């Protein structure tokens, strides 16, 4: 959703894909942005098709080497590294293993690599002075993962909000489902300056991203 919103805001597709090309990932996916509607509201839906036939599951160690050895500008490299490192530390903590040994089942998949790297590239391109975000709602219920059925918020989300001291909305009457993923919280932790809206602001432009899930309120 966030990547689609950035594209809708005007970030060129070339900007989003360039760091993926620089990291040697271009032949592993097909990225498309499509005008769509959800509840009659228009926006952009992002589709990442995985054409990576490799059975190898990436670890944080291999992703770290890919980022550090990649031909990226220093600022962007630091941002991308920070997001993945946060995820690795959190996943390592909840699974009781070293962060380097974490197998990224969900975020190691090529679609998640495209999503994380693309979002970081888009924000780097926009170069805002400050980034604001409302406190996240984590959700409730259960979610199906590579490790089986887990309660919501997922253990990695709990560890990330603890690790990064992220304040969140504790509404026990919140909508059923996973409203904040580990990837989303890691992006928030590394890209957002303030977890509250500014007291006064005006809107010059905005983007709308449409997700894959329909939440029933």
Where are these regions (language model features)?
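Glycine/serine-rich anion-binding loops at beta->alpha junctions
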Residues: 1-2, 102-121
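Glycine-rich nucleotide/cofactor/substrate-binding loop typically near the N-terminus or early
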Residues: 8-95, 154-157, 162-171, 175-185, ...
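Acidic, glycine-rich active-site loops and adjacent beta-strand->loop/helix elements
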Residues: 23, 37, 108-110, 135-144, ...
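Divalent metal-coordination and catalytic microenvironments
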Residues: 46, 111, 188
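General beta-strand structural signal in soluble alpha/beta enzymes
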Residues: 99-106, 132-135, 170, 203-205
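Active-site histidine-anchored catalytic micro-motif
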Residues: 112-119, 131-167
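Conserved small/polar residues in nucleotide/adenosyl-binding loops
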Residues: 215-217
């Amino acid at each position: 959703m966030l990547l689609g919103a950035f594209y809708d805001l005007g970030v060129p597709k070339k900007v989003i894909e360039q760091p993926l090309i620089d990291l040697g990932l271009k032949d592993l996916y097909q990225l498309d942005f499509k005008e769509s509607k959800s509840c009659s509201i228009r926006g952009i839906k992002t589709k990442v098709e995985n054409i990576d036939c490799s059975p190898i599951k990436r670890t944080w160690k291999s992703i770290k080497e890919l980022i550090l050895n990649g031909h990226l500008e220093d600022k962007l490299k630091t941002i991308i590294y920070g997001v993945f490192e946060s995820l690795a530390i959190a996943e390592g903590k909840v699974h009781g293993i070293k962060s380097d040994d974490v197998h990224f089942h969900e975020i190691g998949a090529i679609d998640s690599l495209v999503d994380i790297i693309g979002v970081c590239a888009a924000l780097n391109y926009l170069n805002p002075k400050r980034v604001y975000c409302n406190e996240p709602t984590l959700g409730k219920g259960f979610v199906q993962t590579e490790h089986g059925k887990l309660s919501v918020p997922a253990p990695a989300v709990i560890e990330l909000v603890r690790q990064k001291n992220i304040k969140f909305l504790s509404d026990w009457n919140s909508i059923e489902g996973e409203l904040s993923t580990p990837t989303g919280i890691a992006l928030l932790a590394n890209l957002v300056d303030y977890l509250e809206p500014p007291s006064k602001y005006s809107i010059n432009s905005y983007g709308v991203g449409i997700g894959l899930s329909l939440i029933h309120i």
